[in-house]
């Protein structure tokens, strides 16, 4: 059997990734729950770096936890990435030279690697139970929660035989090197883990099943990953992966040591780490509310990176052209929903008119205002109304409430309480004057409507301009605030507009 020191010496000479090595990054989530913004931010940064460098993004699935993994979650991941336009070069659904890309289908590959690690003396059988480890710590006056103590590293053949005779089952542990482990984090700079601070760790269960601690780096090595870009919560696992990579190089599985970069935590309200349970962490909730991919990608990019100190708004193309993992900040990034909405609003206003109109349809459909196929009249209303709200909303989900009155029948307008409260005492007089002014109009244009109402209500009745059109707005839309009134009346047409004012007049 190779001694630990010999093994460490043989395996520590693994070459580093050099500047000529084509960039290969990966996104490797577990299919559990619904996609959250922290996970998608990780996918985005990997994608942006791959596209910026002309490299490749590999998308694989870590689905070895059968109790928690689900096909529903897997398809939600696909949905999320496709909606955002985050595409991948190799992986699930698209294939590639390193298939299969689901860990649950790679069992034979892992068993082959395990056999080589055992033959090379990089792993050893560990029979100690958690209770025994804790008891040894207590007996030595140490904290019983220190973790594994290395007891099984140097078991004699007699001790091994005795444990086997007792019917014990062994896990396999990787030998950690007896030296400091230092690496240069692409985000945080040089980091050192002192010798002895990370105990030998289990890589294979007693039943022979490989653990995540083994399969994740093995997949990275076999797929030639050059840059491991992941969340800060995985920083503490890096020394174990460095040690494992040395062993994988020694047995011919790894070609080089990848570079590591740990992305900052995403914080929520009260400067607490954003939890999956926090509403703002749910990607699909943001989509339902009306975020568009361009706006959300822009904001997620700002969670640890920026185009420049004074430039918060940029396109996906600008992100790709400028993104460098070395520019990512290590400080925690706070998810500010108000800022996210404001940025989204800017991108909504940047959409071409036809594109904006088409993106409204699913939200109008979800609200029940249009069917699966729009009628010609609904198409006409939407084409004329969309420009009226594009400058006034930050989320697409705000549009149905603003446009509802245009799609409703004249006798289906419900007057909101706040609109009713603001009506003047002489409401009937105002509405009678409005009707008298509107009925004679021949060419039903916004300009003619405004001129007629201004003369009747402001000039003749002496109502202040700010309050003059409120009763008509309420009659037309049922709301105190609506898209531009005169343009809305043009969309409805003269007959419908007059019918609504008469109905409200009673």
Curated annotation (Swiss-Prot):
Give the residues the record marks as binding ATP: 276
Spell out the InterPro entries in the cross-references.
Answer: aa-tRNA-synth_I_cd-bd, aa-tRNA-synth_I_codon-bd_sub2, aa_tRNA-synth_I_cd-bd_sf, Glu-tRNA-ligase_bac/mito, Glu-tRNA-synth_I_codon-bd_sub1, Glu/Gln-tRNA-synth, Glu/Gln-tRNA-synth_Ib_cat-dom, Glu_tRNA_lig_a-bdl
Please give a single GO biological process term from the UniProt record: glutamyl-tRNA aminoacylation
Motif mapping: 'KMSKS' region: 273-277
Query: What are the GO MF terms of this UniProt record?
Result: ATP binding; glutamate-tRNA ligase activity; tRNA binding; zinc ion binding
One Pfam family in the UniProt entry = tRNA-synt_1c
Which SUPFAM superfamilies does the record match to this protein?
A: An anticodon-binding domain of class I aminoacyl-tRNA synthetases, Nucleotidylyl transferase
Tell me the superkingdom of the source: Bacteria
Reactions performed catalytically: tRNA(Glu) + L-glutamate + ATP = L-glutamyl-tRNA(Glu) + AMP + diphosphate
The record's keywords, sorted A to Z, are: Aminoacyl-tRNA synthetase, ATP-binding, Cytoplasm, Ligase, Nucleotide-binding, Protein biosynthesis
Q: Give EC number(s), comma-separated.
A: 6.1.1.17
First-listed, main subcellular location of the protein, grouped into a coarse class = cytoplasm
Identify the residue span(s) of motif 'HIGH' region: 29-39
- Entry GO terms, CC: cytosol
UniProt-annotated location(s): Cytoplasm
Q: Does the keyword Metal-binding apply?
A: no
Subunit description = Monomer.
- Provide the function of this protein: Catalyzes the attachment of glutamate to tRNA(Glu) in a two-step reaction: glutamate is first activated by ATP to form Glu-AMP and then transferred to the acceptor end of tRNA(Glu).
Family according to the record = Belongs to the class-I aminoacyl-tRNA synthetase family. Glutamate--tRNA ligase type 1 subfamily.
Record-linked PANTHER family: GLUTAMATE--TRNA LIGASE, GLUTAMATE--TRNA LIGASE, MITOCHONDRIAL-RELATED
Protein name per Swiss-Prot or TrEMBL: Glutamate--tRNA ligase
Species this chain originates from: Paenarthrobacter aurescens (strain TC1)
- Tell me the gene name: gltX
